[in-house]
Amino acid sequence: MSSPLSASRVALITYSGVPAITTDDRLLRDALVARGAAVDARPWDARTDWSSYHRIVLRSCWNFHHRPKEFLLWVNEVKENHDGTLRNSPELVQWSVDKRYLMDLDAGGIAIVPTIWVSAVEGDVVPNLDALIAAQGWKEGAVVKPAISATAHQTWRVAPDLASEHQARFESLLASSPSGVMVQPFLPEIRDGEWSLIFLGGEFSHAVVKRPADGDFRVQNDFGGTVERREPEPSLIEDARAVLRAAARATDTRVEDILYARVDGIVRDGALLLMELEVIEPMLFFSHAPGAAARMAELIVSR
């Protein structure tokens, strides 16, 4: 198939700590090469002549949450000097760096995990974590995480009867998190698995269920989590599609222009309860879905 941008150059964005692309993204690279593109892995935080690339596609830039200001400056630099090349779009990326984007989705009618947002304001009294959890009646305890985070970094569970033991850690996290901290109820449904529904070009592609290791709640592979391909019910796909539509409205973006998105959540009472919308650097589980990498490659070179 001849593509409009055949013989183009594509940068798959990584970071300086791990500059090579992931094993999963090699499938995307190979599919791009098969369509005539020259493909390079390039860390966002390394000197690069970005003007030489037709497409700059964010992939494993997994340190952005450690350096959010620098990352956003880089995104803005690409937007101003190489307009139209970054995927996902700068507007979508800038909006989603801070998990307070969930407020916009909540306002847009999306069912999200109940969240208490705590910000560190000089002179304010830091809330008592024990009292905060008790006031919500969260009998399973809570999960605490920074508003800017990834891969469960600085994320932990607080048992309801041990919250006072976590106060110092909570205060330390709050002091080191300019964007604030999220406190959410622990969801027992996570033991049954967290759904990840992947969309490419605004269309549903495939889904997996991630399960935590025994005794943990984090589903990431780093913590012993497992992944399996699953076919979701049509209603679950529609719930996830509604998340994309709400994100598109919030960022003045067309749904079909969202190159890739991963909608993460649990199922409660037969409906999706959103945990996160990943549009920056999600694992897309190409190895679990034959043909998905080829579909994304075609979108990259044809739009």
Language-model regions: role of each:
Residues 217, 234-303:
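ATP-dependent carboxylate activation and anion-phosphoryl transfer catalytic cores
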Residues 45-52, 126-136, 172:
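Short amphipathic alpha-helix with an adjacent loop that forms part of the alpha/beta core around
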Residues 105-106, 113, 133-154, 178-190, ...:
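ATP-grasp fold ATP-binding core
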Residues 153, 159-250, 266, 273:
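Phosphate-binding site of ATP-dependent enzymes
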Residues 9, 15-123:
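Conserved N-proximal alpha/beta basic substrate-recognition cap immediately N-terminal to
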